[in-house]
């Protein structure tokens, strides 16, 4: 069945999949930077979310990064910055002066991998497609029925005669991100709390084992 790859994914497998490919990639200079940065991130335990050049208040190079579990601390951002910044300068990938910004995806994050859609199923997202579906290319609705090939969007507002449920293949997406809602904030905070407790529990188990070895 096509759902096997998602329904059989354990929490540990989802967390450890640092090599999961993104659904879409950058173009031009951004694509060049992404290709250069990705091999630098993996040994550090991070994966790329996206690269974006922003022109507000001067040129800003935003590199959005996360750990495979979706977490990203201030210290993590500093680690990535110290690794990436000097090498970008050596490569001279951007000829003009720019500001480097290493950031986490945030709560209203971009959805760039299939596991992102699975992880945030049930929440509202904005989707843009490369082809016209149901007479348009931009959609907003709740993510449901995630499969290996795509998902169903339960749209907020359907025009007269249009279906409220739209099936969207992953191959047809060019942009997707979550919409900030109270429910999303609560769920994101809960997931982060559960993850922190899991790591604390694992650390306690290691300490207990070390104590037993010491006593023996």
UniProtKB/Swiss-Prot annotation:
Chief localisation class: cytoplasm
Gene Ontology CC entries for this record: cytosol
The encoding gene: rimP
Descriptive protein name: Ribosome maturation factor RimP
GO BP field: ribosomal small subunit assembly; translation
Protein location: Cytoplasm
KW Cytoplasm (keyword) present: yes
NCBIfam families in the record: PRK00092.2-5
Keywords assigned by UniProt, alphabetized: Cytoplasm, Ribosome biogenesis
Functional summary from the UniProt entry: Required for maturation of 30S ribosomal subunits.
Family under the similarity heading: Belongs to the RimP family.
Family matches, as HAMAP family: RimP
Matching CDD domains: YlxS_C (cd01734)
Organism, as annotated: Bartonella henselae (strain ATCC 49882 / DSM 28221 / CCUG 30454 / Houston 1) (Rochalimaea henselae)
Record has Transit peptide as a keyword: no
């Amino acid at each position: 069945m096509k759902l096997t790859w998602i329904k059989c994914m354990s929490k540990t497998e989802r967390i450890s999949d640092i090599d999961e490919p993104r659904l879409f990639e950058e173009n031009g200079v951004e694509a060049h930077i992404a290709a250069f940065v990705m091999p630098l991130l993996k040994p550090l335990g991070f994966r790329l979310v996206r690269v974006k050049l922003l022109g507000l208040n001067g040129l800003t190079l935003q590199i959005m990064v996360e750990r495979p579990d979706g977490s990203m601390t201030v210290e993590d951002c500093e680690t990535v910055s110290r690794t990436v910044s000097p090498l970008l300068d050596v490569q001279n990938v951007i000829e003009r002066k720019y500001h480097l910004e290493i950031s986490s995806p945030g709560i209203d994050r971009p959805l760039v991998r299939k596991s992102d859609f699975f992880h945030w199923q049930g929440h509202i997202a904005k989707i843009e497609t490369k082809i016209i579906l149901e007479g348009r290319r931009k959609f907003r609705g709740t993510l449901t029925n995630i499969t290996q090939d795509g998902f169903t969007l339960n749209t907020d507002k359907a025009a007269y005669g249009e279906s409220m449920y739209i099936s969207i293949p992953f191959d047809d997406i060019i942009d997707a991100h979550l919409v900030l809602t109270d429910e999303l904030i609560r769920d994101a905070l809960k997931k982060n709390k559960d993850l922190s407790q899991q790591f604390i529990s694992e650390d306690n188990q290691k300490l207990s084992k070390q104590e037993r070895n010491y006593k023996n």
